[in-house]
Swiss-Prot record:
Positions marked as site (Receptor capping): 268
Domains (record comment): The Ig-like V-set domain comprises three loops analogous to the complementarity-determining regions (CDR) of Ig variable domains, which are responsible for engaging IgM. Mediates multivalent interactions with the CH4 domains of pentameric IgM, facilitating receptor clustering and signaling.
Residues of the site described as Receptor-mediated endocytosis: 386, 405
Disulfide feature: 37-103, 49-58
MF (Gene Ontology): high-affinity IgM receptor activity; IgM binding; polymeric immunoglobulin binding; transmembrane signaling receptor activity
Membrane spanning stretches: 267-287
Primary gene name: Fcmr
Region annotation Disordered: where it falls in the sequence: 178-212, 306-346, 401-426
Stated name of the protein: Immunoglobulin mu Fc receptor
Post-translational modification: Phosphorylated on both Tyr and Ser residues. O-glycosylated. Sialylated. O-linked glycans regulate trafficking to the plasma membrane.
Modified residues (Phosphothreonine): 91
Span of the signal peptide: 1-16
Function: High-affinity Fc receptor for immunoglobulin M (IgM), both secreted and membrane-bound IgM. Primarily regulates IgM transport and homeostasis. In lymphoid cells, enables exocytosis of membrane-bound IgM on the plasma membrane as well as endocytosis of IgM-antigen complexes toward lysosomes for degradation. In mucosal epithelium, mediates retrotranscytosis of antigen-IgM complexes across mucosal M cells toward antigen-presenting cells in mucosal lymphoid tissues.
């Protein structure tokens, strides 16, 4: 019995050890966010709660019919039954909204959790690296593509096309000419250009043209970097959010989304499985013990039945002698149900012979009374105590009916006293 009580005591522990899928969200200060929560069953209470300092306590933020005071007009809950999930929208986020949340279903907020959400609110997003095509030397776009894309920002490219028939080159290696210009403006011995093309004149008479085009090139480079940085930041942010949201419902419904196979550790399933197996083993032992007891009891009952059947004929009490003829009971005798006394000798001669043969030292025997028939008189049946009265009538002693007798109830006063000695016997 103690073992069963311990098992029932530790069964709720298996629910607390369940590992919830976790989603991490990073939102800008003052922005909004959508939290997708799984909905394993419909027509139940849906909620989003916030975990307090004590991990065992989770305060409800929003549910089907409730919104916490601090989150009113900022949090909404929208069920989506066809997708088996419900959405929680949080707007106007502040630093106080940062923390750990959990969404779930059921009437009990602490036991029905299905997902854990970690929300981070930042003032500004960190600097992201430059686009990947800025670092690769072989991924430069052609000049004509830039002309169609940004015609107003690249007027110097059109000038370069008409001024220089030699075109654009990716890598140029030249020897520094001997001029009187200051050494600061002289290029190095080997010069490599891998980002943006430059125009070089065929003669050395116009050395100031490339220097005049440097501001336009710098402005274009700065604007291109800023545009690519914004695009990359937005793309990286959405990609990260999508990648973090995928395990949330992928683990519940198929674990596969857009070709991404996500594996989540499910070692927590082993605990209830082991407990269930242990309960099955104990139940089997109890059933086996009950069957053994039932079989032992049936064998014991069978042995007792056989023993009683064997002793039955030997313990039968004979109600009457087999050789004695049955005497029919008189139908008119209303006292036939009362017990009968032992029969007296049939005649007087036999009684007298017994008296003569008795030894002299023996005490004198009581006088024998021969019972004869008595006229029928109505009796009052008050009890089963009867008085037998008899006298010697003037009839033949050898009469067959002389031994018949009747019983009359013992009355306090007898109606009459017939002549002769009439000792009473009970």
């Amino acid at each position: 019995m103690n073992l069963w009580l311990w098992l029932l005591y530790f069964l709720p522990v298996s629910g607390t050890l369940k590992v919830l899928p976790e989603v991490r969200l990073e939102v800008e200060l003052g922005g909004s966010v959508f939290i997708e929560c799984p909905l394993p069953q419909t027509h139940v209470r849906m909620y989003l709660c916030r975990q307090m300092t004590n991990p065992a306590i989770c305060a409800t933020v929003v549910s089907n019919i409730f919104v916490k005071k601090e989150y009113k007009r900022r949090v909404t809950l929208k069920p989506s039954l066809n997708k088996k999930l419900f959405l929680v929208e949080m707007t106007q986020l502040t630093k106080d909204d940062e923390g750990i949340y959990a969404c779930g279903v059921g009437t009990n907020t602490d036991l029905g959790k299905t997902q854990k959400v970690t929300l981070n609110v930042r003032n500004e997003f960190p600097e992201y690296p430059e686009p990947f095509w800025d670092d690769e030397p072989t991924s430069e776009p052609s000049p004509r593509w830039w002309l169609h894309r940004y015609p107003e920002e690249l007027p110097w490219l059109k000038m370069g096309e008409h001024a220089s028939p030699s075109g654009f080159i990716d890598k140029v290696t030249t020897l520094s000419p001997k001029t009187e210009a200051p050494p600061v403006h002289q290029p190095s011995t080997n010069t490599s250009v891998s980002r943006h093309p430059r125009v070089y004149g065929a003669s050395s008479e116009t050395p100031t043209k490339p220097s005049a085009l440097l501001p336009a090139t710098t402005a274009f480079k700065t604007s291109a970097r800023q545009a690519s940085r914004l695009l990359e930041a937005s793309y990286s942010h959405h990609t990260r959010l999508h990648g973090e949201r995928t395990p949330h419902y992928g683990s519940q419904y198929g674990r596969e989304d857009r070709g991404l196979h996500i594996s989540i550790p499910e070692f927590h399933i082993l605990i209830p499985t082991f407990l269930g197996f242990l309960l099955l083993v104990l139940l089997g032992l109890v059933v086996k013990r009950a069957i053994q007891r039932r079989r032992a009891f049936s064998r014991r009952v069978g042995r007792m039945a056989r023993r009683m059947r064997g002793r039955g004929p030997s313990r039968q009490i004979p109600t009457q002698r087999r050789d004695a003829p049955q005497r029919p009971r008189s139908q008119n005798n209303v006292y036939s149900a009362c017990p009968r006394r032992a029969r007296e000798p049939d005649n007087v001669g036999s009684a007298e012979a017994l008296l003569l043969n008795a030894p002299a030292s023996a005490p004198p025997a009581l006088p024998l009374v021969i019972e004869t028939s008595w006229p029928h008189t109505p009796s009052l049946k008050m009890s089963c105590e009867y008085v037998s009265l008899g006298h010697q009538p003037a009839v033949n002693v050898e009469d067959q009916d002389s031994n018949d007798y009747i019983n009359i109830p013992g009355l306090p006063h007898l109606p009459s006293k017939p002549p002769g000695p009439r000792p009473s016997r009970q």
